Regions:
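Ligand-binding pockets and gating/stacking loops
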Residues: 3-424
Length: 424
């Protein structure tokens, strides 16, 4: 069907079990939101966005949250458990039932299990690039990278495409594209240029003193914005001064956007995570990943079109720095036991919150990394531990992706892999 073909376009292989249901506007939203997943090109995206506007009365008020799991998570320890496979494939962790009939996931994701009826798991995605940059570039742009080892993609990835496409079409008080890092490894804006890179949120939003740094502005106005206390007390006057002096006409796009953001009450409120109710902050988890997920929700609710939040290092002890769980880097199960409960709380809260706040028709959540991990466990001596320990290596032949919201019919497992998780 139409959705099945979408997953196969431009070589990103996928198969679908179940059906693609829902009215045309929802289907159009899903196709737009799945640009990189399905390998859609920029013309594809523009035509589908136009079609989506027609079917929903001209609205473009849709957003995507991409939770990016840098390093490549193991599908076999998260969303595609193989308890019947030999232990050297299926591993030691066990599956649990969920609120979605027929969907089993890892025992270390019990909060996921409670909200599984609100997301889909796609188990049938694969590609051909087993290095981090190539895998990320392939997944995020929809194209085969020309230089797979280049840390920057040769083709524009989804966030910059959205930023370019929506330039001038949405409320200028919020940035179109926000990310927790300047760029994901293997991502980038490529030929679109630096104007469409994200508005970057650095730091840890869980820290008590967290705030978004000032933007870099042209010399003509920098002196008036260097002092944060002056900025907070004089934003209204700054806006009047800028408008009256026609200075806005003499500075470039970057600085116009900077002034719009710095003088926007909406932006300040959205970025100020300290204004969130403590109960909600606890629900997401008082750690780096949980508060990044919460901040992403605040931003799309305020009008940002595309948010990428990296969940690489959870900022806790017991695990490795990212999802790249080779045996030389760390112990497969020790890392899972440290990492997955943090991940579980953040993602389950985000999914639940999107629905509780009535955002599920306009916001799509995508949770993915650049590839899966080898189905067969590869024990090696750990660089730090100096002992033999289990791990899994890079594997683009099979991977799992979680998607939620976007007006989709949820609670589905889409596609499957072979008995040992080797391929779709």
């Amino acid at each position: 069907g139409r959705c099945g073909r979408m997953w196969q376009k431009r070589g990103m292989m996928g198969s679908q079990s179940g059906r693609c249901a829902g009215p045309a506007s929802r289907r159009a939203f899903l196709e737009v939101g799945s640009l990189a997943l399905g390998g859609l090109t920029l013309p594809d995206l523009l035509s589908r966005r136009a079609a989506a506007r027609e079917t929903v009365g001209g609205a473009v008020d849709t957003s995507v949250i991409l939770i990016w799991l840098q390093g490549g998570p193991s599908h076999m320890e998260t969303y595609d458990m193989k308890p019947e496979a030999p232990v050297e494939y299926g591993g030691l962790l066990k599956p649990i039932h969920t609120s979605a009939p027929g969907m089993n996931i890892c025992e270390l994701l019990p909060l996921h299990a409670r909200v599984a009826h609100r997301f889909n798991v796609i188990r049938s995605i694969s590609h051909g690039f087993a290095n981090h940059a190539g895998g990320a570039g392939r997944f995020l742009s929809g194209y085969n990278p020309l230089r797979p080892l280049d840390p920057k993609s040769q083709f524009p990835c989804l966030g910059p495409v959205v930023s370019k496409m929506l330039q001038g079409k949405r409320d200028l008080s919020m940035p179109n594209y926000v990310a927790s890092a300047t760029n994901v490894y293997g991502g980038g804006s490529a030929g679109l240029g630096p104007a469409y890179l994200p508005f970057v949120i650095g730091g840890d939003p869980n820290s008590p003193g967290f705030k978004v740094n000032n933007l870099s502005l042209a010399p003509a106005i920098r002196d008036r914005l260097d002092d944060r206390r002056l900025l907070l007390s004089g934003l209204d006057g700054l806006r009047r001064d800028v408008d009256n002096s026609r200075l806005m006409d003499s500075i470039d796009k970057f600085n116009q956007e900077a002034i719009n953001l710095l003088t926007s009450d909406k932006a300040r409120r959205a970025f100020d995570i300290s204004q969130e109710h403590p109960r909600i902050r606890e629900k997401y988890g008082r750690h780096r990943w949980g508060q990044r997920a919460l901040l992403a929700r605040r931003l799309v609710e305020a009008g940002t079109s595309f948010v990428t939040m990296q969940m690489q290092n959870p900022g806790i002890s017991g695990g490795i720095g990212n999802w790249d769980i080779h045996a030389v880097n760390g112990h497969l199960y020790d890392d899972a036991k440290a990492r997955l409960p943090v991940f579980d709380k953040a993602i389950s809260a985000l999914v639940d919150d999107i629905y509780q706040r009535g955002l599920d028709k306009k916001v799509m959540v995508i949770v993915a990394g650049e590839f899966g991990r080898t189905p067969r466990i590869n024990p090696q001596k750990g660089t730090s531990s100096k002992v033999m320990q289990p791990g899994r290596d890079h594997y683009p032949g099979a991977m799992s992706v979680l998607v939620s919201g976007g007006g989709m019919e949820t609670g589905q497992v889409i596609g499957e892999t072979t008995a040992k998780g080797v391929r779709p």
